[in-house]
Amino acid sequence: MTLQEFQNDIRAGIPDRLPAAKPYDKQINHAPKRKGILTPEEEVLAIRNALRYFPAKHHATLAREFAEELRKYGRIYMYRLRPDYEMYARPIDEYPCRCRQAAAVMLMIQNNLDKAVAQHPHELITYGGNGAVFQNWAQYRLTMKYLSEMTDSQTLVMYSGHPLGLFPSHPDAPRVVVTNGMVIPNYSKPDDWERMNALGVSQYGQMTAGSYMYIGPQGIVHGTTITVMNAARKRFSGGRKDARGMLFVSSGLGGMSGAQPKAGNISGVVSVIAEINPKAAQKRYEQGWVDEMCDSLDALVPRIREACRAREVVSMAYVGNVVDLWERLAAEEIAVDLGSDQTSLHNPWAGGYYPVDVSYEASNKMMAEEPARFRECVQESLRRQVDAINKLTARGMYFFDYGNAFLLEASRAGAAVMGEGGRFRYPSYVQDIMGPMFFDYGFGPFRWVCTSGRPEDLELTDRLAAEVLEEIRATAPAEIAGQLDDNIHWIREAGRNRLVVGSQARILYADSEGRTRIAQAFNRALADGRLSAPVVLGRDHHDVSGTDSPYRETSNIYDGSNLTADMAVQNVIGDSFRGATWVSIHNGGGVGWGEVINGGFGMVVDGSEDADRHIREMLLWDVNNGIARRSWARNEGAMSAIRREMERTPGLQVTLPNVADEELIRNILKENE
């Protein structure tokens, strides 16, 4: 397809003449069939809802087709409308547009649907089993058409993948405002999502899937590396200074979990990651994100012993069920140093977790046709997995929950994960590592995308970012010196670690000052021509301020407000009028529908004075909103960080807590008994 044909296809939106039906591509990784949850009347409603995108002359043809999709897959994806062109992040100048910011959004959307990047690209799912960009291909086509027509004085409104339309606004307003899964709280259970998604009225956007900010497995790899490195440091003794020879065991080689073997290599450990889906494991192997693949435990166990004995730095994919792996390691009495889990347990009944002793294919069939039995099998598997993990922790393994709802779903299954006082026996990685060491000080997963598509532009941004961090490190207080040292090392090595999958993007943990100064350095490089095209700034929702999630991002909030969502909602509102190009707010990212409120932004930096103003105003708020909240929760690192920010920033006045003596209160209450 020529560039002109591609641009014409974008501008056409939903074609008046229906394209030919598409064959089902068995080479692509597909979403499992969703369980049939709709009543006969609701099935009628789902098809009527889908037909709203098409003129009446096509209804007879499409109604029959959509009924078949609903029966066969549990959803209406409108496969017929899937474009014929290759889906990937093109250079920004190849997108037809009246507004360059809109072209940047188109680039980000296509990256999320690139088959090299997305988990189930033909079902418009980027990662996590159900993290969707759109619900169907009509929504994709109509959204791209609107973006091609948008001016700097319009805003596109997105309701859970549905483009509501272009509305008049102004150049400083967001170009796109995204909501995903925003439902009345009483209707936020997993089956509510199944029903509303099948009806075509809501979707689960995960974190960066439905917000157009996914950058492949790189998006989580810096955070995963930080976690593995600091978990390993907790095990250092006797003067040990590196992690070589340590064994890290986990599961998942999907969109986010696929970062684990690369993080293991960067951290210097032997990592063994189980993955039930052979296509997912093969994809990560071909992309260079895992070194070796093995589908036999009899072959894997001696290889693990050999690698640990030789202090190799190597990552291995076990293509099989994670429960089998844990049970074999426990039985063989192999010394596992670090353990975790990154199965998609936010989505346990629809492909996020596969039960032991049932094949991958049989599981996919069972979850749709026998959902109650599938649920029983999953819960039995969780109990067995936890039993094996408990045996290994009794021998000294450090196990941490990665915020994927593993401990939550294991507890619901009756697994032995509870400790004293009704608390989990294992910590969340945010409680032990990420929260007190990083989030409380404002460090989080800042990211950027070079819209030129040129590797040399990305290399320049890496150098600029490293220079900024080194300048900050020269005068930084001791309490954040270690974090800065690790982050400087990370960005210096990023190119050599071959992290790019899809768009020319980079992830870097940075605090408020670091993010702002790095973004300003990019803007200057654009203004003087050193960078050839705009840069998109963003972050994961898994950050200081963007997400209220009691089992992950806010699990180290102990004042009782961990179940509130004021921070995430305030954050997206504040970003929207301080210069974000697009903003998003979602239900359920990471831990699951009904368990989380999470949001994010995208900002197009183009070398202009307006861009510099937006950088200064928005990035300050986007980080310090969360630090202020964490400070009010009496987190010591956050109290220190927000005091430092108030000294640095004129006009910033934050309410600080007066910390009461807990023993004083307990004694007074005893007096009144």
Task: Please name every model-derived segment.
Residues 315-343, 350:
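Active-site/ligand-binding-proximal alpha/beta "capping" segment
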Residues 535, 539-570:
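Small-residue-enriched alpha-helical segments and adjacent helix-cap loops
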Residues 278, 320-323, 342-347, 403-409, ...:
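Glycine-rich beta-alpha junction loops
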Residues 149-151, 167-171, 186-187, 238-243, ...:
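Solvent-exposed alpha-helices and their adjacent loops that cap or buttress functional pockets
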Residues 237-238, 258-261, 327-329, 387-389, ...:
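Generic recognition of flexible, low-complexity loop/linker segments
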Residues 205-229, 233, 244-247, 253-313, ...:
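Catalytic or ion-translocation cores adjacent to nucleophile or general acid/base/metal-coordination motifs
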Residues 270, 335, 398:
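Residue-level detector of anion-binding/catalytic polar loops
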